[in-house]
UniProtKB/Swiss-Prot annotation:
Species for this entry: Danio rerio (Zebrafish)
Name of protein: Interferon-induced GTP-binding protein MxE
Record-linked PANTHER family: DYNAMIN (PTHR11566), INTERFERON-INDUCED GTP-BINDING PROTEIN MXC-RELATED (PTHR11566:SF199)
Main location as per UniProt: cytoplasm
Family the UniProt entry places it in: Belongs to the TRAFAC class dynamin-like GTPase superfamily. Dynamin/Fzo/YdjA family.
Protein's cellular compartments: Cytoplasm
CDD domains, per the entry: DLP_1
């Protein structure tokens, strides 16, 4: 038997219209996959899926010309990347099996099946479990099409034998990982002798691709179709039953009896063509180029090349975004800890200095922020604005309700004064009542600003020291202690401020000016009405004047207290404490890097190299196209 598994006449004509475009396109994706960037990028691909015993392995066997693992139960236990390369100069057959960083050259196609089985056992273990790890089988021959396919495990509905109980869920999860990508064409293999609407493979494909834009149906086993059902099969292939954008094709591969009779793959292709040519029902499908393995190979190559070309711009965008993010993540982790003792000390000084510099910029409201984030002081300023609104609303509310309030006081507490004389004690009591109502909002302002500063500093500590647990702990203690200390000091000052506000005081000229303004302003509030007594009118003027002055004083004083303690003093204390760590502790103790961080840095460096290599491959392809 020829290792090619295809008739010379058919295979020599395969893809002759695409020879200049086909190989470079497919080589591009194969090269990217070989670099390992499939972990990072969604590469254009054709994934082959089907229920168990759908004939999926037989189709791949016919396309590749080699015997692949087949039988009952789960045959494909790992994703198998089948890379077929058509060569013209060298007539010899070459095989290359790669998995888990192992490479095995194969000179005899008869050894493929066992080699793939051994690879599956190495990755998925003994038994019938599956693995997400990929096996790559590359075949170079003059008789194969230029094509790359990904063979996925057949869908099992019920666990049998020593299969895991959740084997169906595992397989579906693996299949979905591939076919849900917009870059993947799903090649759905379905036996022609069953109702295709009941197949799990087609259901899965339609779930992730409801319009059938990325799905091509392949019907197998046409020789097993019940008599009278042939027209239904023809209608299915003609896209009249369950329409798919890419439509359907039909093939007849070797059955078990053919294998038992030692029917070679070359003879099987000849037998397939005769079957369609001589079948009165299916002959039209052959005439429409919708039947036989060679025509399927040609169609798949065309589909893959067009799909790669279509997805190339998105692939380039994906690559650029991943490169940018990986570089940023790597910068965020920083360099690893030096081994030299002196260099370690310098490294610690650098880390603390960088941390303190960021704190300084926060204090000066000059830190760098990326959208949609906001500078710390901008958030604090928003809280100060809210505080000012509270004071303003207090003044407005006072003007609106003052008349009734003063009338009540005059009615219940007026002494021997003649009309028009202001009772100073009544004036003081009303002032103190209104100012006392501002005490709690002032304390809330302090708490809200403290939360903003705490969150920001905590984020900065994590950003700079999260890789070093001892240094992180050393930084966390003063962060919390000094915050609590400055909060208490600010809180006491606010209490003190409101105790002072119980003393009713203002400079005479300031008060006189404000009183004049109040009299001019309040005339519109009904205070000139004959129903308002002179006592009420005069008291309202004085109260409005004083509360306006007091609110203006508090509008500045409370934010000053909060800013001084929770930003200036707190950050200065924290900076000094961090500098103090340099002399107190051994750099080696503080700079003990978490193993997870070192591993992540290594992974990011490897990813960056993969992506850069992929970028060079893509760039070379684009410029040579």
């Amino acid at each position: 038997m020829s290792p090619s598994g295809s008739t010379k006449g058919e295979s020599s004509g395969l893809n002759q219209h695409y020879e200049e475009k086909v190989r470079p396109c497919i080589d591009l994706v194969d090269s990217l996959r070989a670099l390992g960037v499939e972990k990072d990028l969604n590469l254009p691909a054709i994934a082959v899926i089907g229920d168990q015993s759908s004939g999926k392995s037989s189709v791949l066997e016919a396309l590749s010309g080699v015997a692949l693992p087949r039988g009952t139960g789960i045959v494909t236990r790992c994703p198998l990347v089948l890379k077929l390369k058509k060569i013209t100069k060298d007539k010899s057959w070459h095989g290359l099996l790669t998995y888990n960083d192992k490479i095995r050259e194969l000179k005899d196609p008869a050894k493929i099946e066992k080699a793939v089985l051994n690879a599956q056992t190495a990755l998925a273990g003994i038994g019938e479990g599956i693995s997400h790890e990929m096996i790559t089988l590359e075949i170079q021959s003059c008789d194969v099409p230029d094509l790359t396919l990904i063979d996925l495990p057949g869908i099992a509905r019920v666990a049998t034998g020593n299969q895991p109980e959740d084997i169906e869920k595992q397989i579906k999860s693996l299949i979905e990982k591939f076919i849900k990508r917009q870059e993947t064409i799903s090649l759905v293999v379905v036996p022609a002798n069953i109702d295709i609407a009941t197949t799990e493979a087609l259901k899965m494909a339609s779930t992730v691709d409801p319009t059938g834009q990325r799905t091509l149906g392949i019907l197998t086993k046409p020789d097993l179709v019940d008599r009278g059902m042939e027209d239904t099969v023809v209608r299915t292939v003609n896209n009249e039953v369950i329409p798919l954008k890419k439509g359907y094709m039909i093939v007849k591969c070797r059955g078990q009896q053919d294998i038992n009779d030692k029917l070679g793959l070359v003879e099987a292709l000849e037998k397939e063509r005769r079957f369609f040519d001589e079948n009165v029902h299916f002959r039209s499908l052959l005439e429409d180029r919708k039947a036989t393995i060679p025509l399927l190979a040609e169609r798949l190559t065309k589909e893959l090349v067009e799909h790669i070309a279509k997805n190339l711009p998105q692939l380039q965008n994906q690559l650029e975004m991943k490169l940018e993010k990986t570089s940023a993540d790597l910068r965020g982790l920083g360099d690893g800890v030096p081994l030299d003792k002196n260099e370690k000390s310098n490294f610690l000084i650098m880390k603390i200095r960088q941390f303190n510099d960021v704190l300084e910029r926060v204090q000066m409201a000059e830190e760098d922020v990326e959208k949609p984030n906001t500078r710390v002081f901008s958030k604090i300023r928003s809280e100060f604005v809210k505080w000012k609104r509270i004071l303003d609303s207090k003044a407005i509310k006072t003007e609106e309700t003052l008349r009734d309030e003063v009338q009540e006081y005059v009615k219940t507490r007026r002494g021997k004064e003649l009309p028009g004389f202001v009772n100073y004690r009544t004036f003081e009591n009303i002032v103190k009542k209104h100012i006392a109502e501002l005490h709690e909002p002032a304390l809330k302002l302090l708490k809200d600003v403290t939360d903003i500063v705490h969150s920001s500093v905590d984020h900065i500590v994590n950003a700079h020291f999260s890789s070093f647990s001892p240094l992180m702990r050393a930084a966390k203690d003063p962060t919390e202690d000094f915050l609590h200390e400055q909060f208490q000091r600010a809180e006491e000052k606010i209490h003190s401020q409101f105790r002072m506000e119980k003393i009713v005081y203002s400079q005479d000229d300031l008060y006189s000016d404000q009183l004049t303004t109040a009299k001019n302003t309040l005339r519109g509030y009904g205070l000139q009405s004959p129903n308002v007594s002179a006592d009420v009118r005069e008291m309202a003027y004085h109260l409005t004047s004083y509360l306006t002055i007091a609110c203006e004083r508090l509008a500045n004083q409370i934010p000053l207290i909060v800013q001084y303690h929770m930003l200036n003093q707190y950050i200065s204390q924290l900076q000094n404490a961090m500098l103090g760590l340099i002399g107190k502790n051994s750099p080696g103790m503080l700079l003990c890097e978490d193993s997870g961080v070192a591993r992540k840095r290594k992974d990011l460096k490897e990813r960056l190299e993969r992506l850069k290599s992929a970028g060079r491959v893509l760039s070379k392809f684009v410029h040579s196209a």
